Amino acid sequence: MKTKDAVAVVTGGASGLGLATTKRLLDAGAQVVVVDLRGDDVVGGLGDRARFAQADVTDEAAVSNALELADSLGPVRVVVNCAGTGNAIRVLSRDGVFPLAAFRKIVDINLVGTFNVLRLGAERIAKTEPIGEERGVIINTASVAAFDGQIGQAAYSASKGGVVGMTLPIARDLASKLIRVVTIAPGLFDTPLLASLPAEAKASLGQQVPHPSRLGNPDEYGALVLHIIENPMLNGEVIRLDGAIRMAPR
């Protein structure tokens, strides 16, 4: 699948890994619809091939409207799920037991939201004419927490583990439609989630990465997205993008 002239949808595309992906896609010649809760000012500065659609990824109608906007630009070929959130709550703590509503919120956004965008995006892609061997590709974002969850990450790890777990069966589901599904599991990246940390703390985190011993650059995530789009044999796979880190319990 060639990225040039393709129509892509990126959730969470106004910041962090999603914004880096959006910029990479635009640089490669794609048209991009950024789906996010806020960030129209950011997207407005990216040029006329970038559009903004405000939507909660768990909202079926809002996501459908965003995909309708993408369809108006041409056949949708690429969907990248970067929207997500997290919390740090122990099952039992001084504050009491983990609130069920807090657990559900994380799973709803990270797992159910990803699936919602995936299924509606797949429906659009399946209606397009094949280009060579395929119609399109869907790329999801998990986390190394799916494999090495730390203390306080029960909800986050469960949500990202769900994204990992559904990758292969959905790739098999969509194979007959000529749609690929791949998941990226990033490690420690320099994103807005870490923006509040002092420089010394971020440097300390980076030193935990075996090689290269630093935080990942969001552009490196975007580079992998482009490679996945253009490599037709990448399908049903979860790729750890983490510098060989394996997270300690805390």
Curated annotation (Swiss-Prot):
One of its GO terms (cellular component) is peptidoglycan-based cell wall. Keywords: Oxidoreductase. The keyword Zinc does not apply. The keyword Lipid biosynthesis does not apply. NAD(+) binds at S15, L17, D36, D56, V57, C82, Y156, K160, F189, T191. Substrate binds at S143. CDD domains: HSD10-like_SDR_c. One of its GO terms (molecular function) is oxidoreductase activity. It comes from the Bacteria. Gene3D superfamilies: NAD(P)-binding Rossmann-like Domain. InterPro entries: NAD(P)-bd_dom_sf (IPR036291), Sc_DH/Rdtase_CS (IPR020904), SDR_fam (IPR002347). Pfam families: adh_short. It is an enzyme of class 1 (oxidoreductase). Its EC number is 1.-.-.-. The active site is at Y156. Belongs to the short-chain dehydrogenases/reductases (SDR) family. This is Uncharacterized oxidoreductase Rv1144.
